[in-house]
Curated annotation (Swiss-Prot):
This is Ribosomal RNA small subunit methyltransferase G. GO terms for cellular component: cytosol. One of its GO terms (molecular function) is rRNA (guanine-N7-)-methyltransferase activity. Coiled coil: none annotated.
Amino acid sequence: MTEKLKQGIDQLGLKVPETIQQSMLAFLAFLQKWNQAYNLTAITEIKSMITHHLLDSLSILPYLKGDKILDVGSGAGFPGIPLAFACPEKKFTLIDSKAKKTAFLLQAASRFKITNVTIIQERVGSYQPGFYFDTITCRALGSVREIMEQTNHLLRPGGQWSIMKGTYPEKELRGTDASAIVHVLNVPGLKAERHLVEVKNNKG
């Protein structure tokens, strides 16, 4: 599994220290254990988790902007946890409304000493942190328009939404901000289509 992750990270063109890669794998094992009782993810094998969770999450790393990142509907911690492992200089806030998921994330952050993450249990529409985020990201959570509307109060002017999608979201992009850019994500070992929708926040 170590080699599978290393090869995938190399194929993504990323530089992640081996010690951090080992921590990522340990996190997956921790998730697998919790998943037996709390049903946090439908993917149960470590080999598949590496592809569908770790590498999929890390594929958006080159597109992150700024130092304050919000991961909306983080669930079992994707993409937020892998990105936090890989970018210790950035501050990540992971928000989810479900108690069992935030309980897992709190335990994981403590166990693996992920000091650059903050875990919030709350609906994102009600979240008022008192500051703006530079990038808001999410995976498998609502339409592009819905995500933008629910989080508009949290993104700084000039900041960006980085929304992970499967197939090209043509219908979702109709009527959204004209500055939307769609990147094709090539996730090593993943045959399914993956895209990243980038939308700049033009509010002044």
